[in-house]
C-alpha cells in the first residue's frame, strides 16, 4: 500500500473524531504563493509526489489555471498529519487571490474554521490581503500567518539577518492592524498573530522550508543560520532540517480550532434560526446524532459525474442513499458521497458532522444552498461577497442548433459560480453574462468553448452602470391607466451609511422581515429619521421603500403591488434601464378606487412605477459607473509610460510609494477605462510591470459625458437614445 493510499485509510478513521479535524483555507493576494504552499503541504503529508510539488500545482488542476499560473477556483484536498503522537485530518481549500475571482474566496470561508494568511515578504500586505482578512474575520474564521518568499529578502534585496527580522515585524504589525480593524470585538485581541505564541511562520514554499519560533527551538536553528543556508544556496539542506509541511501543519493543529470548538461561536454568526431548537443545539455542538445540516459552498461540474455539491456538514451524519431537502429545490437522494483529494474523489459510505464533503445527487443545489434532513430548516445566512459584477458580455451561439445547449450551459455555469450573473433572453437569442472583471469573463467563455464544446460569439465587454439621483424630487403623481388610482412618490439619495449597512449585510433585503424592529433600529442608527424607519416597507438592492402616509383606505391591500412597482423601477431606472443604486423612495399619499376590481396589478403597478420615474426625473438623474483601484509596480525609468496610459483611461493617480528600485502607483480608474488595459500596459512597459486591481464602488459619470454614454446604452438595448422626461410620465 503506497503512502497516499495509507493516508487515505487513516483519513477514513479520523472523519469520525471532530477533535482531530481542522478545516482550513489558504488566502492571500495574487501571486503571494498560496497554491505552491498548498501543493507542498499536500506532498509533505504524503498525498502527492514531493518532486512534483510546487511545479505540479496539484490544486490548480484546471487547464486554464495552469496556463495562466493563477488559481481561479477554490480547490479542496484532505490530508493526514501527526503531532505529538496523534494523527489529525486537515481539510484544506486553496482560494484564488485575483480580484475577479473573489466570490470563490467568500464561499470557501463559509466552509472553514481557520485560515493561513500568506504574505510575500518582499511585497508585504497588499489590497487583496486586506480583502481576504476582512472576509475571514466576518465569517469568524481564525487566522495564522505565513510569511513567504523569505529567500528573496536575502538573495534579491540582500538584507542581513537583523534587517530580515525588522521586515517580519512590519508585516506582523500590518496584519495585526487588519485583525484589530475587522475582527469581532470578542476576538480582536485574542486572535492577534504573535511570533512567540507560534501563530507566525516564515519560509519559502517553493524551496520547501519553513520555521517558526517554536520550530527554531526544536530544530536548534538561529536567524543567522537561516541567512547562511539561503545565501550560500543550501536551501535543499534547510528543507531537510526544517520541512515546510511539518512547521506549517504543526502551527495549524496547535493554533486553529477544531469544528466542535469553532461551531460554538460561528453558528450564531452564519445561521439566524432558533439556537434552542433541536437543529440549533446540534449545530452548536457539532453533534453527529442531530438532524443533518449542511451548507453547499461550491458546485463542481464534472463531465462524467455531472454536478457535484461540495459543502460543510455542521450536524448529523449523511449516508449514501440519505433523503435530504435542498432549500428552494425540494427533496433529493444522495447517490455518491466522497472526500476530495485535489482532483481525486475518494468514495465513502457515510460522513459525520464537522467535515467537508462532496455529494452527487443533490438536485437543484447551488452554491449557498442549505441542505437538511428537515423539510423546514431555516436556511443559512446568504454569503455576501463584497462586489457586484461590473463587466458584461453579450453572448450567442455561433450555430443556431446549439442555442438550447447554450442556455443549459449558461444556467449550469451560474450555478457553479454565483458571482456570474446570466440574463437569458429567449426571444432575441442574445444572452448577457456579467462577471467581476474582464479576466473572469474570459475564463468563463473559454470554459463554455472547451469544457462544454459550444461555439459562441461574444460582443466587446460592456460596463455595468447604475442610476441614482442628485437631490430630492416629487411627490410626483402617477395615474393608473383607468385613471381611478393615483400615487404620490418622493425620491432622494439614501444616506451613505444606510447603503454601506445594506452592502455589509447588517440590514437585510426583502419585505418580510423576521425581526422588523431590529431592522428599523439599524436603519435609524444608520441615518434615517425615527418616522422614516417606522415606515419601512421593503429593501431591494441598495434601495429602500418607505410608507409615509397616514390612514389611507385600501392601501394595505394594494401594498404588495406597490412593492412590485418599486422593484421594477429599481431593476430598470428611467435613464438607461440600468439598476438603481442608493435611493430612498417614500410613498407620501395615495387615492384609491373603493372597488378592488379597479385596482388590480395592471392598474397599480404602472401607476406606482411612473410616479417613481417622474420623481426621479425631477430629482436630477445621475449615471454611476463602477471604479477600480489599480496597484501597479514598475521600475522607476518607465513610470512615465504607465502614468500616461492611466491618464488616457481617465485614471487619477492617488499615491506613489517607492520600494527600492520599484515604484508602486496607486490609481482610481473607471472600469470602462480598464477594458483592454492588461495588453496595453504590457506593450507600453515591455512586460516589466506587475499590476492588480480591486473594485472600488461607484462614481458619477462626468457630467459632460453622461448624455453620450446614456444614448449608447439605450441604443444597445433597442430604446430611443433620449430618455423620457417628467412631462412624459405626467401625461400617462
Swiss-Prot record:
PANTHER family in UniProt: ELONGATION FACTOR-LIKE GTPASE 1, TRANSLATION ELONGATION FACTOR-RELATED
Gene that this sequence comes from: fusA
UniProt organism field: Picrophilus torridus (strain ATCC 700027 / DSM 9790 / JCM 10055 / NBRC 100828 / KAW 2/3)
UniProt-recorded name of the protein: Elongation factor 2
InterPro entries per the UniProt record, alphabetical: EFG_II (IPR041095), EFG_III/V (IPR035647), EFG_V-like (IPR000640), EFTu-like_2 (IPR004161), G_TR_CS (IPR031157), P-loop_NTPase (IPR027417), Ribosomal_Su5_D2-typ_SF (IPR020568), Ribsml_uS5_D2-typ_fold_subgr (IPR014721)
Domain of life: Archaea
Lineage of producing organism: Archaea, Methanobacteriati, Thermoplasmatota, Thermoplasmata, Thermoplasmatales
Pfam families attached to this UniProt entry: EFG_C, EFG_III, EFG_IV, GTP_EFTU, GTP_EFTU_D2
Places the protein is found: Cytoplasm
Assigned keywords, A-Z: Cytoplasm, Elongation factor, GTP-binding, Nucleotide-binding, Protein biosynthesis
GO cellular component: cytosol; ribonucleoprotein complex
Principal subcellular localization: cytoplasm
Similarity section: Belongs to the TRAFAC class translation factor GTPase superfamily. Classic translation factor GTPase family. EF-G/EF-2 subfamily.
Binding, GTP: 28-35, 94-98, 148-151
